[in-house]
Amino acid sequence: MDLYNLRNNMRSRYFSMLEYLNNGFEIFKMFVKKHPLLVFSHFVFSTVMVLFITFPFTEQAVKMYEFAQKVSNTKMQKNININEYASLLSSLFSMLLLYALISLILQFVAVIIRKKAGLEIEMEEDAEKEKIKKDKFKLGKITLKFIIMMAVYLIIGLALIMLIVVFSLVLDSSSALFIVSVIYFTLFFNVLYLQQIYYLRDVNLVEAFRYNLYLSKGKRLRILLPIIMIALITFFINYALNYFTGITIGKLQNLQILGIVTSATGGIVKTFSVLYTIIAENLVYFNVEYMDLKGLK
């Protein structure tokens, strides 16, 4: 793919959604060839996550549900073992922590992919520019940014949970969830360019948020439509793969093999979806920023 012409085109006009998707897919193929280990690591952790949800996590959740049913049954309350409850609760909590850890690793790999993909798009292919790429890709700095971002996400998540609790005290639960959902989506629609700016530019989180609000004016649909389209493509691919896998391996009547194969296909689809979405988001961001800078000249 000719990235030089791509950059020139992004500086001269706004792309259509189809152009974002087509160019994004070409860069996706190029990125997979240049960074196979990075892509493979995302696939491995994605597969592990699906496997984790399919087997141990689901098993513990079912046991916890069965115990809750036992507690609700008045005839069986005398036979309740407190140690059994503590053991189940401890196991479930450990599973949640492990799930959170795998999720964090996946998000960190996605951040590295975003940074490397952004550098691939923006930088020229010669020895001097390759040196600039290495200088701009500083793992320590990216890690620090990631930790700050995750801390902010955690604070926002806890704040939303607290709001649900507070609103539930004065309103019914459905109304409380509706209000918090409105707050969540309001936040979501106002951070559409945040990650691209934060990880691709040398700015802090506050500066990135302000610039994100500036670029978002009239440009929210420009980034939302490609994301929605990729999500739909991913859904149909995932559905087709699961259907084919279910028919093929279901004949063996072996749930373990079915779970493993489904997890592997799920890992492939998730990696494709994340990588394709990240590249499309980067393209939209660069295009919007270049055109904004062009308008200021």
Task: Locate each region found by the language model.
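N-terminal entry module detector
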Residues: 13-95
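A generic signature of intrinsically disordered, low-complexity regions enriched in glycine/proline
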Residues: 46, 50, 54, 208, ...
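Juxtamembrane transition segments at transmembrane-helix termini in multipass membrane proteins
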Residues: 2-14, 60-86, 106-107, 111-125, ...
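Hydrophobic alpha-helical transmembrane segments in multi-pass membrane proteins
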Residues: 38-60, 90-107, 145-188, 225-252, ...
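Polar/charged alpha-helical tracts
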Residues: 5-8, 19-22, 26-30, 51, ...
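Interfacial aromatic "cap" segments that immediately flank transmembrane helices
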Residues: 13-48, 130-157, 187-237
